[in-house]
Amino acid sequence: MELERSRRTAAAMAALCLLAASAYIWRDKDEEAVMASAPAAVAASGDWGLSFQTEGAAPVGNATAEHLGQYDAYYLGDTGKKVIYLTFDCGYENGYTEQILDALKKHNAPAAFFVVGNMIETAPDIIRRMAAEGHIVGNHTFHHPDMSRIADQAAFREELESLANLYKETTGQELPRYYRPPRGKYSEENLKQAQALGYKTVFWSLAYVDWYTDNQPTADQAYAKLLPRIHDGAIVLLHSTSRTNAEILDALLTKWEDMGYTFASLEELPECR
């Protein structure tokens, strides 16, 4: 058991070394250009992307909410309410997650933390705190691979179930059935596979380039992305490894509250229609 765990940990660490280099679809190009070029497609496959067309309005995704909905997949919440769904991707512990949890607790704001195997193995107390404070801990796979390249159902299931099993070993609880594809890479078959395993796939409708730990945005740069683009029903993606996110989260939540927004759990997402 321990030998297998060590092997999995080594594999996870190797995969995480690629995380900063491959992050999300905006990595290799200018953020604005990639966002603006994301088409309003019907097909659900490829790299998740967004096009922000009107300030304060929900962006257009490269798959429609209706098409994603048939697979219990989301990129928007309730767009009829001034509500925000906070989510954090946690590839590893970088020393900022507890500060983020403190800010969430201060604002009584629920969040979802999408974690990988390394995060649970190296920071079990933080994982237990997330659960104890009422946050969702979601499945970001064990090794953080490109899931769009995994067509085999057994291999896909193993990535999710090994993470779910580790979470249960660590907390004594079942892992909530929310899944986020690593780096936003997915295929329509993946969405079907996740749905068959009882998962809701959660993309996002607002994010910014916050994952380069050695090139963090300033607070003003973060606000310039996150404030004008916020919209009703936003599913916000932030990274828990970001120093800037930890430093501004309290003030950011206050600013959103001053704009009339409240915060909701993914458990409150509207049923897919």
Model-predicted segments: where are they?
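A short acidic, amphipathic alpha-helical/loop segment
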Residues: Q99-I100, D125-R129, N190-Q193, I248-L252
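Terminal accessory/targeting
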Residues: M1-I84, D102-A111, D232-R273
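Conserved strand-turn element in the central/C-terminal portion of the radical SAM core barrel
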Residues: P181
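Alpha-helical scaffold elements lining the catalytic groove of polysaccharide deacetylases
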Residues: A63, Y96, P145-T171, K185-D232, ...
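Active-site beta->alpha N-cap acidic-glycine motif
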Residues: G49-A151, A155, E159-K168, L175-P176, ...
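Histidine-centered catalytic micro-motifs
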Residues: I136-H143, G184, L238-T241
